[in-house]
């Protein structure tokens, strides 16, 4: 790939966006950025704190500003937050400014990958499965709407998924 286009990873929490993104960036010799990490750096607090103090709406405003800034860069692999696609502005920017890769996974895999993670405000509930099912119902069509490439991440290592994405990117660009 001569041209270093942006690659934006979307998908639900626990799909592997950050882990796969790091492998992908390394393979493609691109910079890896996690939008949630940038939000935390700019805020000086973790995502859970932002949710507690500003609510989801306050967090989404911050996320929209960060995604706008990051998608204007060139040659990056960006792992977005699971809810970033809620914003039509974000969906438009992601679609227009790079190749969108949707990382699909099952609710079971999400539960297994997130069950000990206390940094996921939406899962701090007695019924995380119900939350994930509702999020999937609401968000999966939005991921599909903007995806240029879709990859299932369930039973493969992050490195294998990254390899698959590289092959698909080569086919997509040609």
Curated annotation (Swiss-Prot):
GO molecular function, one term: shikimate kinase activity
Keyword list, A-Z: Amino-acid biosynthesis, Aromatic amino acid biosynthesis, ATP-binding, Cytoplasm, Kinase, Magnesium, Metal-binding, Nucleotide-binding, Transferase
Reaction it catalyzes: shikimate + ATP = 3-phosphoshikimate + ADP + H(+)
Record-level GO cellular component terms: cytosol
Cofactor: Mg(2+)
Classification via PANTHER family: SHIKIMATE KINASE, SHIKIMATE KINASE 1, CHLOROPLASTIC
Protein name: Shikimate kinase
